[in-house]
Protein backbone atom coordinates (compact mmCIF):
# COMPACT_ATOMS: atom_id res chain seq x y z
CA UNK A 1 0.00 0.00 0.00
CA UNK A 2 1.02 3.63 -0.10
CA UNK A 3 2.80 5.27 2.79
CA UNK A 4 0.50 7.03 5.29
CA UNK A 5 -0.30 10.73 4.91
CA UNK A 6 1.67 11.10 1.67
CA UNK A 7 -1.44 11.26 -0.48
CA UNK A 8 -1.74 14.33 -2.72
CA UNK A 9 -3.26 17.37 -0.98
CA UNK A 10 -6.84 18.06 -2.02
CA UNK A 11 -6.44 21.62 -3.27
CA UNK A 12 -3.25 21.40 -5.31
CA UNK A 13 -4.52 20.53 -8.78
CA UNK A 14 -3.74 23.53 -10.97
CA UNK A 15 -4.93 24.14 -14.54
CA UNK A 16 -2.15 25.39 -16.81
CA UNK A 17 -1.79 25.79 -20.58
CA UNK A 18 1.71 24.84 -21.73
CA UNK A 19 3.67 24.33 -24.94
CA UNK A 20 5.80 21.19 -25.20
CA UNK A 21 7.94 20.65 -28.31
CA UNK A 22 5.76 23.10 -30.22
CA UNK A 23 2.50 21.46 -29.18
CA UNK A 24 0.00 23.39 -27.07
CA UNK A 25 -1.40 21.32 -24.21
CA UNK A 26 -4.21 22.13 -21.83
CA UNK A 27 -2.72 20.54 -18.73
CA UNK A 28 -3.32 19.85 -15.07
CA UNK A 29 -0.44 20.05 -12.60
CA UNK A 30 -0.77 17.96 -9.44
CA UNK A 31 1.47 19.39 -6.70
CA UNK A 32 2.40 16.88 -3.98
CA UNK A 33 3.69 16.65 -0.44
CA UNK A 34 6.69 14.69 -1.72
CA UNK A 35 7.91 17.69 -3.72
CA UNK A 36 6.87 16.36 -7.12
CA UNK A 37 4.69 17.88 -9.84
CA UNK A 38 2.72 15.34 -11.89
CA UNK A 39 1.54 16.93 -15.15
CA UNK A 40 -1.35 15.53 -17.19
CA UNK A 41 -3.18 16.45 -20.38
CA UNK A 42 -6.53 17.55 -19.00
CA UNK A 43 -8.35 16.48 -22.17
CA UNK A 44 -6.98 12.92 -22.37
CA UNK A 45 -5.75 12.26 -18.82
CA UNK A 46 -2.39 11.07 -20.17
CA UNK A 47 0.88 12.19 -18.52
CA UNK A 48 2.60 15.03 -20.36
CA UNK A 49 5.98 13.59 -19.39
CA UNK A 50 6.85 10.00 -18.58
CA UNK A 51 6.16 8.83 -15.02
CA UNK A 52 8.51 6.02 -14.01
CA UNK A 53 7.77 3.35 -11.44
CA UNK A 54 11.00 3.11 -9.43
CA UNK A 55 11.97 0.74 -6.67
CA UNK A 56 11.82 2.29 -3.20
CA UNK A 57 13.05 1.16 0.24
CA UNK A 58 11.19 -1.79 1.76
CA UNK A 59 12.98 -1.79 5.11
CA UNK A 60 12.53 -1.28 7.96
CA UNK A 61 9.13 -2.98 7.83
CA UNK A 62 6.55 -2.94 10.59
CA UNK A 63 5.45 -6.59 10.98
CA UNK A 64 2.22 -7.15 9.06
CA UNK A 65 2.79 -4.28 6.63
CA UNK A 66 2.90 -4.87 2.87
CA UNK A 67 4.32 -1.97 0.92
CA UNK A 68 4.32 -1.29 -2.79
CA UNK A 69 7.76 -2.21 -4.16
CA UNK A 70 7.70 0.86 -6.44
CA UNK A 71 6.46 4.44 -6.39
CA UNK A 72 5.76 6.82 -9.31
CA UNK A 73 8.52 9.33 -10.10
CA UNK A 74 7.83 12.02 -12.73
CA UNK A 75 10.74 12.53 -15.12
CA UNK A 76 9.87 16.24 -15.53
CA UNK A 77 9.95 18.75 -13.96
CA UNK A 78 12.62 18.15 -11.28
CA UNK A 79 11.45 17.94 -7.67
CA UNK A 80 10.78 21.37 -6.20
CA UNK A 81 11.69 20.35 -2.63
CA UNK A 82 14.59 18.46 -1.08
CA UNK A 83 13.83 14.78 -0.51
CA UNK A 84 15.20 12.11 1.79
CA UNK A 85 17.69 12.62 4.60
CA UNK A 86 21.40 12.18 5.25
CA UNK A 87 23.90 13.69 7.69
CA UNK A 88 24.83 16.25 5.02
CA UNK A 89 21.36 17.80 5.35
CA UNK A 90 21.71 18.58 9.06
CA UNK A 91 22.15 22.01 10.60
CA UNK A 92 25.82 23.00 10.38
CA UNK A 93 26.16 26.55 11.66
CA UNK A 94 29.28 25.32 13.49
CA UNK A 95 31.10 21.95 13.48
CA UNK A 96 30.00 21.37 17.09
CA UNK A 97 26.34 22.01 16.27
CA UNK A 98 26.54 19.65 13.30
CA UNK A 99 28.10 16.94 15.46
CA UNK A 100 25.26 17.31 17.99
CA UNK A 101 22.71 17.07 15.16
CA UNK A 102 24.32 13.83 13.97
CA UNK A 103 24.02 12.42 17.51
CA UNK A 104 20.30 13.25 17.50
CA UNK A 105 19.83 11.68 14.07
CA UNK A 106 21.45 8.45 15.26
CA UNK A 107 18.33 7.82 17.38
CA UNK A 108 16.14 7.56 14.28
CA UNK A 109 15.72 5.59 11.08
CA UNK A 110 16.27 7.72 7.98
CA UNK A 111 17.14 7.41 4.32
CA UNK A 112 15.89 8.29 0.83
CA UNK A 113 12.39 9.36 -0.09
CA UNK A 114 9.73 6.75 0.77
CA UNK A 115 11.75 5.12 3.58
CA UNK A 116 8.96 3.30 5.50
CA UNK A 117 7.83 4.03 9.07
CA UNK A 118 9.46 1.88 11.75
CA UNK A 119 8.57 0.68 15.24
CA UNK A 120 9.65 3.00 18.05
CA UNK A 121 11.39 1.12 20.87
CA UNK A 122 12.07 2.56 24.37
CA UNK A 123 15.78 3.25 24.63
CA UNK A 124 16.28 2.45 20.93
CA UNK A 125 14.93 3.54 17.58
CA UNK A 126 12.53 6.49 17.95
CA UNK A 127 10.91 6.10 14.53
CA UNK A 128 11.51 6.99 10.89
CA UNK A 129 12.11 10.59 9.86
CA UNK A 130 10.08 11.53 6.77
CA UNK A 131 11.37 14.32 4.53
CA UNK A 132 9.44 16.13 3.21
CA UNK A 133 7.16 15.83 6.21
CA UNK A 134 3.61 14.53 6.22
CA UNK A 135 2.59 18.17 5.79
CA UNK A 136 4.82 18.67 2.75
CA UNK A 137 6.58 19.85 0.71
CA UNK A 138 3.53 21.53 -0.71
CA UNK A 139 0.12 21.21 0.87
CA UNK A 140 -3.34 22.77 0.78
CA UNK A 141 -1.99 26.24 -0.12
CA UNK A 142 -1.46 24.91 -3.63
CA UNK A 143 0.30 26.82 -6.40
CA UNK A 144 -0.21 29.84 -8.64
CA UNK A 145 0.13 30.13 -12.42
CA UNK A 146 0.99 33.13 -14.59
CA UNK A 147 -1.28 32.47 -17.60
CA UNK A 148 0.84 34.62 -19.93
CA UNK A 149 4.22 33.03 -19.22
CA UNK A 150 2.92 29.58 -18.13
CA UNK A 151 5.23 29.75 -15.12
CA UNK A 152 3.92 27.93 -12.06
CA UNK A 153 4.89 29.17 -8.58
CA UNK A 154 4.94 26.66 -5.73
CA UNK A 155 5.37 27.59 -2.04
CA UNK A 156 6.79 24.73 0.00
CA UNK A 157 8.48 23.93 3.29
CA UNK A 158 11.53 21.81 4.02
CA UNK A 159 10.44 20.05 7.18
CA UNK A 160 10.44 16.62 8.77
CA UNK A 161 7.95 14.47 10.63
CA UNK A 162 8.27 11.29 12.65
CA UNK A 163 5.39 8.80 12.72
CA UNK A 164 5.83 7.25 16.16
CA UNK A 165 4.52 3.67 15.95
CA UNK A 166 4.60 1.52 19.08
CA UNK A 167 3.65 -2.01 20.01
CA UNK A 168 0.37 -2.11 21.92
CA UNK A 169 -0.49 -3.88 25.14
CA UNK A 170 -2.56 -6.94 24.11
CA UNK A 171 -4.80 -6.33 27.12
CA UNK A 172 -5.70 -2.89 25.75
CA UNK A 173 -6.13 -3.59 22.04
CA UNK A 174 -6.36 -6.38 19.50
CA UNK A 175 -4.17 -4.30 17.19
CA UNK A 176 -0.52 -5.19 17.44
CA UNK A 177 0.76 -1.69 16.65
CA UNK A 178 -0.59 1.85 16.82
CA UNK A 179 0.59 5.32 15.93
CA UNK A 180 0.76 7.60 18.96
CA UNK A 181 1.99 10.79 17.31
CA UNK A 182 3.07 12.36 14.03
CA UNK A 183 5.30 15.15 15.25
CA UNK A 184 8.82 16.15 14.33
CA UNK A 185 12.03 16.39 16.27
CA UNK A 186 14.16 19.34 17.25
CA UNK A 187 17.82 19.79 16.53
CA UNK A 188 20.60 20.78 18.93
CA UNK A 189 20.25 23.81 21.23
CA UNK A 190 16.66 24.44 20.16
CA UNK A 191 17.58 24.80 16.49
CA UNK A 192 15.85 22.98 13.63
CA UNK A 193 17.49 19.66 12.81
CA UNK A 194 17.88 20.62 9.14
CA UNK A 195 20.03 23.31 7.62
CA UNK A 196 18.21 26.20 5.91
CA UNK A 197 16.38 27.22 3.80
CA UNK A 198 13.21 26.13 5.57
CA UNK A 199 10.72 27.53 3.06
CA UNK A 200 10.96 28.30 -0.63
CA UNK A 201 8.91 29.54 -3.55
CA UNK A 202 9.89 27.64 -6.70
CA UNK A 203 9.17 28.97 -10.18
CA UNK A 204 8.90 26.29 -12.88
CA UNK A 205 8.78 27.32 -16.53
Annotate the PLM regions.
Residues 1-205:
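Beta-sheet-rich non-transmembrane sensory/scaffold domains
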